């Protein structure tokens, strides 16, 4: 047996012994009828206590004679004979308990408290005071075991080191990792901030189907499921776009939805098959209006959630305070590949030659617009570090966007980039039903030619357009990627509570 295997075997034995001892303690508690009581009520959380009383002097606290009730998980314990110090962790953080034998009911300290384990959930009552080192603490007069933990916590000094274990056992990650807890608290604040921002601008939050007969609104490979009652194959949605625009046809002129999308594609540091998007649609607006709205949204969230418009990310600092850069797709190609002759991007053979020279395999089904987009992705995207809007996307890769009035080969569309990755996609919506029908047919032909991500023909949506869609602009923002930026997280799994994982065999 190797040294590593031997160590692993020893750890399993230690865990089994630890769990056996804890189960024996639980059995004893069951005999006493008190393993999982549900009659303890707290009146403060740790963060509330620190916010209210950290600034007070020891003498002032003593004079105030404040009694509080707290509850949480026992993370550390230092037993020093007749007295002990405990670190209690709750949703707000940590608070120290001072537990003295003579200040508790008879028998509680020796017969109960000293037999409890780290990870157990406790309820405590007592008076606030400050230790000689100035730490806010609770001098306990009542201490109760609320939940017996049968498994030990991760090592208190090293936490949960295995990255896979952090994702599979997120509950342990949240218990032992302050950074992880703060990431998901920030995510919650971002979502609340988005909703507040949107409602303040007259948008109505709605919900649209997660299972669809025809998946639409994006170019992606869908998940397929089966509806037994209808005996019908259905698709988990890849985007809510076509349903949201039906609502605009119906007269809801400003709508948004924050919900999950599903795309049956690869998993990477930037991609999870199940992810959260915010999509909005705004009647009597164009893509330029949404560029302004997007810039305002990100600037507002940075200031309100983080308290600054200077957001650190790795070695970079994103500046949301100054105006965001705006480039056309071709300008971006020229900027990051200066040797490009712009005229070559107007010619199929010349553009194909450029693409192949930088390692892009050009598929037979691609037209000029797709080739130029692939060149942009290859030479420019990774360099778009500071907040940047890219405009003038080819119509070929924008089947739902309105054609530009001056040049019908491009659309009134933008994508928003930060940190070298796309965060948002918006455009003036195509509201010409006949043009939309033809573009759907083009997508059907592309699918027949082997493009698995090409869109389906959605006849019902074309029918909706035939009733009249007002001039409208729409925007989609990837919430997970947004949270990555605001929390300095470098893999999407760090900002999704339960990311997709292969089952453990």
Curated annotation (Swiss-Prot):
One of its GO terms (molecular function) is lysine-tRNA ligase activity. Gene3D superfamilies: Bira Bifunctional Protein, Domain 2, Nucleic acid-binding proteins. Its EC number is 6.1.1.6. Pfam families: tRNA-synt_2, tRNA_anti-codon. It catalyses: tRNA(Lys) + L-lysine + ATP = L-lysyl-tRNA(Lys) + AMP + diphosphate. SUPFAM superfamilies: Class II aaRS and biotin synthetases, Nucleic acid-binding proteins. It comes from the Bacteria. It is found in: Cytoplasm. Mg(2+) 1 binds at residues 415, 422. Belongs to the class-II aminoacyl-tRNA synthetase family. This is Lysine--tRNA ligase. It comes from Salmonella typhimurium (strain LT2 / SGSC1412 / ATCC 700720).
């Amino acid at each position: 047996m190797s040294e590593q295997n031997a160590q692993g075997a020893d750890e399993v034995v230690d865990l089994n012994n630890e769990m056996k001892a804890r189960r024996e303690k639980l059995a004893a508690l069951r005999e006493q009828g008190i393993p999982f009581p549900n009659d303890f009520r707290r009146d403060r959380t740790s963060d509330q206590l620190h916010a209210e009383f950290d600034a007070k002097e020891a003498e002032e606290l003593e004079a105030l004679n404040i009694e509080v009730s707290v509850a949480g998980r026992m993370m550390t314990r230092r037993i020093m004979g007749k007295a002990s110090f405990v670190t209690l962790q709750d949703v707000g953080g940590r608070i120290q308990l001072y537990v003295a034998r003579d200040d508790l009911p008879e028998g509680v300290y020796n017969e109960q408290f000293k037999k409890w384990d780290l990870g157990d959930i406790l309820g405590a009552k007592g008076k606030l005071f400050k230790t000689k080192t100035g730490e806010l603490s609770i001098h306990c007069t009542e201490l109760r075991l609320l939940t017996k933990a049968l498994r030990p916590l991760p090592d208190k000094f090293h936490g949960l080191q295995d990255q896979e274990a952090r994702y599979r056992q997120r509950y342990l990650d949240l218990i032992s990792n302050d950074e992880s807890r703060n990431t998901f608290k920030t995510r919650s604040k971002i979502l609340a901030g988005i909703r507040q921002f949107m409602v303040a601008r007259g948008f109505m939050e709605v919900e649209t189907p997660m299972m669809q007969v025809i998946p639409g609104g994006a170019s992606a490979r869908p998940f397929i499921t089966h509806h037994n009652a209808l005996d019908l194959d259905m698709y988990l949605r890849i985007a809510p776009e076509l349903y949201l625009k039906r609502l605009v046809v119906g007269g809801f002129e400003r709508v948004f939805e924050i919900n999950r999308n599903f795309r049956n594609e690869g998993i990477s540091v930037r991609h999870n098959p199940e992810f959260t998007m915010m999509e909005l649609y705004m009647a009597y607006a164009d893509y330029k209006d949404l560029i302004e709205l997007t810039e305002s949204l990100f600037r507002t969230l940075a200031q309100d959630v983080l308290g600054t418009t200077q957001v650190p990310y790795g070695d970079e600092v994103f500046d949301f305070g100054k105006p965001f850069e705006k480039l056309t797709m071709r300008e971006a190609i020229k900027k990051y590949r200066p040797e490009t002759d712009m005229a070559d991007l107007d010619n199929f053979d010349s553009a194909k030659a450029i693409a192949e020279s930088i390692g892009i395999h050009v598929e037979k089904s691609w037209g000029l617009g797709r080739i130029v987009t692939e060149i942009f992705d290859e030479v420019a995207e990774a360099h778009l570090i500071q907040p940047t809007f890219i405009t003038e996307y080819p119509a070929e890769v924008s089947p739902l966007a309105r054609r530009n009035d001056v040049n019908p080969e491009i659309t009134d569309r933008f994508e928003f980039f930060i940190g070298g990755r796309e965060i948002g996609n918006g455009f003036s919506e195509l509201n010409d039903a006949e043009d939309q029908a033809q573009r759907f047919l083009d997508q059907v032909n592309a699918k027949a030619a082997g493009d698995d991500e090409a869109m389906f023909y959605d006849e019902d949506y074309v029918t909706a357009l035939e009733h009249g869609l007002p001039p409208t602009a729409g925007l989609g923002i990837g919430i997970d990627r947004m949270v990555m930026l605001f929390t300095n997280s470098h893999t999407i799994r760090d900002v999704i509570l339960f990311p997709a994982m292969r089952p453990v065999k």
